[in-house]
Amino acid sequence: NLYQFKNMIHCTVPNRPWWHFANYGCYCGRGGKGTPVDDLDRCCQIHDKCYDEAEKISGCWPYIKTYTYESCQGTLTCKDGGKCAASVCDCDRVAANCFARATYNDKNYNIDFNARCQ
C-alpha cells in the first residue's frame, strides 16, 4: 500500500523526504501522462504500469493492499503473501530501488503538469 511504499522509499533514499517524490515530473504522485521528464519520472511511470498489471489480479487493489517485507541497510525483500501482495510489494520494491539509482532534479518537482506533460 502507499504507506508501505513510502517506508520503502525512506529505506532506499533516506536523505530525501518521501513527499519530494509525490509531486515530481509527469508520473510521480498523480497518475500521469506524456513523456517522463527524466529517469526518476520513468521509475514512477513503470510503477504506475506495474500497479495497472496488479489490478488485473482478481480483488487486488494496489493502493491499499498490505504486504510483508523486510528492509535491511537499504535492501528490500518481499515475503510470501499471496499473488496480489507479492505483486504489489514487488512493484514498490522495484520502484524504491529505481528511485535510489536515479538523480533527483529539483527543477522537475512541482512542474506545470498541463504544460510539460502532454
Swiss-Prot record:
Enzyme class: hydrolase
Cystine bridges: 11-72, 26-117, 28-44, 43-98, 50-91, 60-84, 78-89
EC number(s) recorded for this UniProt protein: 3.1.1.4
Active site per database record: 47, 92
Cofactor(s) the protein requires to work: Ca(2+)
Protein name, as recorded: Basic phospholipase A2 1
Highest rank taxon of the organism: Eukaryota
Protein location: Secreted
Short name of one Pfam family: Phospholip_A2_1
Keywords, ordered alphabetically: Calcium, Disulfide bond, Hydrolase, Lipid degradation, Lipid metabolism, Metal-binding, Secreted
GO biological process terms held by the UniProt record: arachidonate secretion; lipid catabolic process; phospholipid metabolic process
PROSITE patterns: PA2_ASP (PS00119), PA2_HIS (PS00118)
The UniProt record lists the keyword Secreted: yes
SMART domains: PA2c
Record's cofactor remark: Binds 1 Ca(2+) ion.
Family of the protein in this entry: Belongs to the phospholipase A2 family. Group I subfamily. D49 sub-subfamily.
GO CC terms, sorted: extracellular region
Reaction it catalyzes: a 1,2-diacyl-sn-glycero-3-phosphocholine + H2O = a 1-acyl-sn-glycero-3-phosphocholine + a fatty acid + H(+)
Gene Ontology MF terms: calcium ion binding; calcium-dependent phospholipase A2 activity; phospholipid binding
Main location class: secreted
Annotated Ca(2+) binding sites: 27, 29, 31, 48
InterPro entries: PLipase_A2, PLipase_A2_Asp_AS, PLipase_A2_dom, PLipase_A2_dom_sf, PLipase_A2_His_AS
Role summary: PLA2 catalyzes the calcium-dependent hydrolysis of the 2-acyl groups in 3-sn-phosphoglycerides.
Expression across tissues: Expressed by the venom gland.
